Regions:
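Terminal module of membrane-associated proteins
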Residues: 1-337
Length: 337
C-alpha cells in the first residue's frame, strides 16, 4: 500500500552503524515524505519507485543513485544543501516546486534520463561559461555536455524553444572546454574549438543580440579608423575637411567615456564599443559607402597594398558578423528540429 513518512526523524550520523539507507528498496505504491528530519543524508541507491513519489519540506542532503522512477515525482518546498541524482531514470513527469539551495548550489544530475516533462526553475539548470570553466576534469565536462543535451531535447519536445536555445549554448560551452582539456586533439578538433570560442565571444552562440550588435560597431569602427589613418598618412590635409563642431563633440564624448570607465560605470569592452560608435557616426556622416567594404575594391579609386588587405579582411569579418546577426535575430532558428 501507500507509504508515508510524515515528520519522521532519521537520526543516524556518519559514524553510526545504522544508516539512512533505502538501498535496492522497491516501492510498489505511492511514497510520501513530508517534514522529514535527516541528520546527515538519505540514500536511495538502486531503489525503484513504481508509482508517484512526493518529497515535501525536506531540509537536508538527499542522494539518488541508480534509481528508477516509474510514476510522477514531485519535490516541493525543499531547503537543502545538496540534491544528487546519478544514473537516474525519470519515466514520468518530474516537478521541482519552491526549492531553495544553501550557498547558491544547484541540483546535480549525472547520466540521468528524462522521458517526460521536467519542470524546474531555469536558474537551477542554468550555467554560465565561468561556472563550467571551473571544472578541469575531462569526464565531468562530458557529463555536463550530456546533461545539457538531454535537457535541451526535453525542452524542444515540450516546445520550450527559448530555454532550449540557452541549453544549446551551455552544451557548446561544455564542448569547447572538453576540447580544451582533451589530449592529442586532431586538426579538425582544434579548428572546432576555436570556432566555438569565436561564436561564444561574438554572440554567445546566437543567444545575445546586443553582444552581436556591439561587435558589428567594433568591426566597422576599427576598419574606418585604420582606413582613415592610412589616408591621413598620405595626405595630412584631410584633417582640415573635418567639421570642427564634430571634432569638439567627439573629444567631449571620449572624455566622458574615460571618466565613466575610470569610475567603473562601464566595463572595458563597452568602453571600447562606445569609442568605435563615435567613429561609426563619423563614417555615416562623411563616407557611408565604405561600410560595404568590397564596393571600394571594384571602384575607380586606387588603393595601396595595406588598404586592399584591410578592405578584404574587413569584408570577410563584416560578412561573418552580419550572418551571425541575422541568425541571432531569429533566435529560435538555432534550435535543431
Amino acid at each position: 500500500g501507500e507509504i508515508r513518512f510524515v515528520e519522521t526523524k532519521f537520526l543516524s550520523k556518519l559514524d553510526n552503524e545504522i544508516a539512512n539507507n533505502f538501498r535496492e528498496v522497491v516501492f510498489e505504491d505511492k511514497v510520501y515524505f513530508n517534514k522529514t528530519k535527516i541528520n546527515t543524508q538519505i540514500n536511495f541507491k538502486m531503489a525503484k519507485f513504481k508509482n508517484n513519489v512526493e518529497f515535501v519540506n525536506l531540509h537536508n542532503n538527499v542522494s539518488f543513485n541508480n534509481v528508477n522512477f516509474k510514476g510522477i515525482v514531485n519535490f516541493e518546498n525543499l531547503n537543502i544543501n545538496t540534491l544528487n541524482f546519478k544514473n537516474v531514470i525519470f519515466n514520468n513527469i518530474v516537478s521541482f516546486d519552491n526549492i531553495r539551495f544553501d550557498n547558491n548550489c544547484k541540483p546535480n544530475f549525472e547520466n540521468c534520463t528524462f522521458s517526460d516533462q521536467f519542470n524546474i526553475e531555469h536558474k537551477y539548470i542554468e550555467y554560465k561559461f565561468d561556472e563550467i570553466e571551473k571544472t578541469q576534469e575531462y569526464d565531468k565536462l562530458l557529463n555536463y555536455r550530456d546533461l545539457f543535451r538531454k535537457l535541451k531535447s526535453n525542452r524542444i519536445a515540450h516546445h520550450n524553444l527559448i530555454d532550449a536555445s540557452e541549453l544549446r549554448a551551455q552544451e557548446l560551452y561544455a564542448r569547447e572546454l572538453e576540447l580544451k582539456h582533451k589530449e592529442n586533439k586532431s586538426l579538425k578538433e582544434k579548428i572546432e574549438r576555436w570556432q566555438l570560442v569565436f561564436y561564444r565571444k561574438l554572440c554567445d552562440h546566437h543567444t545575445d543580440l546586443l553582444l552581436n550588435l556591439k561587435w558589428l560597431v567594433v568591426v566597422i569602427g576599427l576598419f574606418a579608423l585604420l582606413y582613415f589613418a592610412s589616408r591621413m598618412i598620405q595626405d595630412i590635409s584631410l584633417l582640415k575637411a573635418l567639421n570642427q563642431y564634430g571634432v569638439c563633440l567627439s573629444i567631449v564624448g571620449v572624455f566622458n567615456l574615460l571618466c565613466l570607465y575610470w569610475f567603473g560605470c562601464i566595463k572595458k569592452f563597452d568602453f571600447f564599443v562606445y569609442l568605435n560608435l563615435i567613429v561609426v557616426l563619423w563614417v555615416i556622416c562623411y563616407m557611408p559607402k565604405i561600410i560595404f567594404g568590397i564596393v571600394n575594391i571594384i571602384g575607380d579609386k586606387s588603393y595601396n597594398g595595406f588598404e586592399n588587405a584591410l578592405i578584404t579582411i574587413y569584408t570577410i569579418l563584416l560578412a561573418l558578423v552580419l550572418f551571425s546577426l541575422q541568425k541571432t535575430a531569429r533566435k529560435n532558428s538555432i534550435v535543431p528540429s
